[in-house]
Curated annotation (Swiss-Prot):
Cofactor comment text: Binds 2 magnesium ions per tetramer.
Primary location class: cytoplasm
UniProt protein name: Phenylalanine--tRNA ligase beta subunit
Subunit structure, interactors included: Tetramer of two alpha and two beta subunits.
GN (gene name): pheT
């Protein structure tokens, strides 16, 4: 919300300077983002009047003007297309200094003397208009200092409001806050009801009362929209960063800024029959005021006539029903559209308007009539015309209702760490427009006004007290609690421990958004319907992630684009999966790796990381809680992973994650020019381990046997190891695969697996007969179950 300081001080003017006011607003939770001067730095500019003009003798586009400053007449050469006798303009006299250290001196233009300069808005930095002179009203006082005339010793203050403070998106709301902060009186403009000068009306039907509980309309005839908007209004709009369009649009924008109620003016001649507020028909077309044609969805509320949609309710009007300079009769709309009905609709159509910004945050449902009367009065004053009666349709059952709140002094003391005087509590809350009455000893009954839709609980009232009293004035009180130590399950590994493990293995932690681009969701999950947000932050953050990979890969791309060739990232967070019984939110831990296996160094090679390097990292995570033997890696399929480098990770038959290389087609789509490996694990499964069992170290020698086995190339090494474990007996202490070979001397459909087995008995030495017998059992089982034989 951006506004003029002088406009605000017209409502409430505490005896403090600008800096103090800005600081107090920020401390009260209305954070001031910027304070900018209302105009550039200039001096020596007065209100001038062009008395006469004549053609320059040597230049077709220049005019020689006689300009008065109220006391003298000066000859000025000007090339502006709109210069003419009788025009009043900003006149920079000799010696004036304009923005950019530009000094006005006597000069000759094509041989004709020029004593000053006639100025445009852009030259004085009071607007963007540079296609001609700034035209002042006919009643402008010639000779008056231009800065004084336009009250340019002003500033535009921009306040960054949190979404719950929609009540401050107006001068009325801001003035109410300032008045409460400084205990200063607030002078609200007196809005008089405009009597009807004719009886013409248009019928209003609200077919979606839950979305539009209140709708007001009024016919205003014989307006003259060719009349200019008064300069005082144009300036207030400009200082609020609102561009002047025409009188009707400017007035609706002005009232919106002043009171907080969005309004809309329709060209009455373009309305067929009456007004119908309804839900759009699926695929219904509407060309908006910005020229964009949209295809409406059935969940969009529209204002329509009897034949077509006229506007997206609370967002933007249609082009064909908008007012123009030729409009003679206007239908003025002032409505209360439900917050939920409007929320997200603007963004879903790629729009963001001042009206939607306010409706999404909440508009005072009792404000519509006052705003209608205020806009009508201004419209008649500026453009002429006659107003008809107000037509109002209300659905009382759908209007918001706020129940009274009980506020306890004990709770205030508990939360703020101090006792607050009862009179002070009542004064602060009354200053905000809340009705406070004592309700027994040490408590109050508080009625919340319609403009404070963010207050519904006792803690909300206490927050208001803290804001107005001043956070910086609250005493420091440390919390006291009796905390007993919590027993930790020894068979679990906490997330912080897993984080430290991955950091120790060369990873860096990343935090990415849970919202992703639906297009990116489709790349990682082709054919799967994404979970779309009803009110996304932006179109490229409209889907909930079903995996942590999209965010991690995006972070990887960001680093690769900045010459980081070795990237190892991990993240822990929720994934969101739609199920028949509802949304499943599951904590996951995932990683992405690319680049060299080891950091660059003189004694280290530059080998590129591969699948088995990442598998080793995953095994370290899986084994951290002591349950690595419960996990298995099996060949798997995943649409985002390389079909030949993908493993499904299982725990006792349950799928707990995936590991693999990014699919080549996906890499191409993402612009990745090197191998990228990823893993993702269900955090609950990873964290759950088992208690280790301790045994006395054996003092007897180990016995080792190495077996070279021939198996079909499609037989997984894990399957071979599982069969060996099942038949190796209880004294097997170590089993490892140390070589895999395919090539010369072995059939093309076979491969050689070399495994090492180590046995050790805790209380005696194993003899060869025992080991040989066990080895033979292993070989027999391998041949029977996997057709794997000893290599000869």
């Amino acid at each position: 919300m951006k506004f003029s300081e002088q406009w605000l001080r017209g409502w409430v003017s505490p005896q403090v300077d600008r800096d103090a006011l800005v600081a107090r607003l920020s401390m009260a939770g209305l954070e001031v983002d910027s304070v900018t001067p209302a105009a550039g730095v200039f001096s020596g500019v007065v209100v001038g009047e062009v008395l006469s003009t004549e053609q320059h003798p040597d230049a077709d586009k220049l005019r020689v003007c006689q300009v008065s400053n109220g006391a003298e007449t000066f000859q000025v050469v000007c090339g502006a297309p709109n210069v003419r006798p009788g025009l009043k303009i900003p006149f920079a006299m000799i010696g004036a200094e304009l923005p950019g250290d530009f000094k006005i001196k006597k000069a000759k233009l094509r041989g004709v003397e020029s004593n000053g300069m006639l100025c445009s808005q852009a030259e004085l930095q009071i607007g963007e208009g540079n296609d001609g002179l700034m035209e002042l009203p006919a009643d402008a006082s010639v000779g008056e200092d231009f800065r004084v005339y336009l009250d340019l010793e002003d500033a535009s203050i921009e306040v960054d409001l949190t979404p719950n403070r929609g009540d401050c998106l107006s001068l009325a709301g801001l003035a109410r806050e300032v008045g409460a902060l400084y205990d200063a009186p607030v002078t609200r403009p007196v809005v008089m009801a405009v009597p009807a000068a004719h009886d013409e009306v248009r019928s209003v039907e609200v077919l979606a009362p839950a979305a539009c509980p209140r709708y007001l309309g009024r016919v205003i005839r014989n307006v003259d929209l060719s009349r200019p908007t008064p300069l005082w209004m144009v300036e207030r709009l400009r200082r609020a960063e609102v561009r002047s369009i025409d009188a009707a649009v400017d007035i609706t924008n002005y009232v919106m800024l002043e009171l907080g109620q969005p309004l809309h003016a329709f060209d009455l001649a373009e309305i067929n029959g009456g007004i119908r507020v309804r839900m759009a028909e699926e695929g219904e077309k509407l060309v908006l005021l910005d020229g964009q044609e949209v295809s409406l969805r059935s969940d969009t509320l529209v204002v329509a006539d009897h034949t077509r949609a006229l506007a997206i309710a609370g967002v933007m009007g249609g082009e064909h029903s908008g007012v123009s300079a030729t409009t003679r009769d206007v239908f003025l709309e002032s409505a209360f559209f439900d917050q939920i009905a409007v929320a997200g609709k603007a963004r879903s159509y790629g729009l963001h308007t001042d009206a939607s910004h306010r409706y999404e945050r909440g508009v005072d449902w009792q404000l519509a009539r006052e705003a209608m009367e205020r806009a009508t009065g201004l419209l008649l004053e500026i453009t002429g015309g006659e107003a008809g009666p107000i037509i109002e349709t209300v659905s009382e059952q759908h209007l918001p209702s706020i129940a009274p709140i009980t506020l306890r002094a004990q709770r205030i003391t508990q939360m703020l760490g101090m006792e607050m005087d009862s009179a002070e509590v009542e004064r602060l809350l009354n200053a905000l427009g809340l009705k406070v009455s004592a309700d027994g000893a040490g408590q109050w009954r508080v009625e919340v006004p319609s403009h404070r839709f963010d207050i519904s609980l006792e803690v909300d009232l206490i927050e208001e007290l803290a804001r107005l009293y001043g956070y910086n004035r609250l005493p420091v009180r440390y919390p006291q609690a009796r905390l007993a130590p919590q027993a930790k399950a020894e068979a679990r590994s906490d997330l912080p421990e897993l984080r430290r493990l991955l950091v120790a293995r060369g990873y860096q932690e990343a935090i990415t958004y849970s919202f992703i681009d639906p297009k990116q969701f489709e790349l990682f999950n082709p054919g799967v319907e994404p979970l779309l947000l009803a009110n996304p932050i932006s179109n490229d953050m409209a889907a909930m992630r079903s995996s942590l990979w999209p965010g991690l890969v995006k972070a990887l791309q960001h680093n690769l684009n900045r010459q980081q060739d070795r990237v190892r990232l991990f993240e822990s967070g929720l994934r969101f999966v739609g199920q028949l019984e509802g949304l499943k939110q599951e904590p996951m831990i995932a990683g992405v790796v690319c680049g060299s296996r080891l950091p660059e160094g003189w004694a280290q090679g530059r080998d590129t990381v591969d699948f088995f390097d990442v598998k080793a990292d995953v095994e370290a995570v899986l084994g951290f809680a002591g349950a690595l033997d419960q996990f298995t890696f099996a060949p798997g399929k995943h649409p985002a992973l390389h079909p030949g480098q993908t493993a499904r990770i299982e725990r006792e038959g349950r799928e707990v994650g995936f590991i693999g290389a990014i699919h080549p087609e996906l890499s191409k789509s993402l612009g990745l020019d090197r191998p990228v490996f990823v893993f993702e694990l269900v955090l609950a499964e990873v964290a759950l381990g088992k208690m280790p069992k301790f045994h006395e170290l054996s003092r007897f020698p180990e016995v080792r046997r190495d077996l070279a086995l021939i198996a079909h190339k499609d037989v997984a090494a894990s399957a071979v190891l599982d069969v060996i474990r099942e038949n190796a007996g209880e004294w097997l202490t170590d089993l490892r695969l140390f070589d895999v070979y395919q090539g010369k001397g072995i059939d093309t459909d076979r491969k050689s697996l070399a495994v090492g087995l180590t046995w050790q008995h805790p209380s005696r030495t194993l003899n060869d007969d025992e080991v040989n017998s066990t080895t033979q059992n292993i070989l027999t089982s391998l041949e029977q179950r996997l057709n794997a034989t000893l290599r000869k």
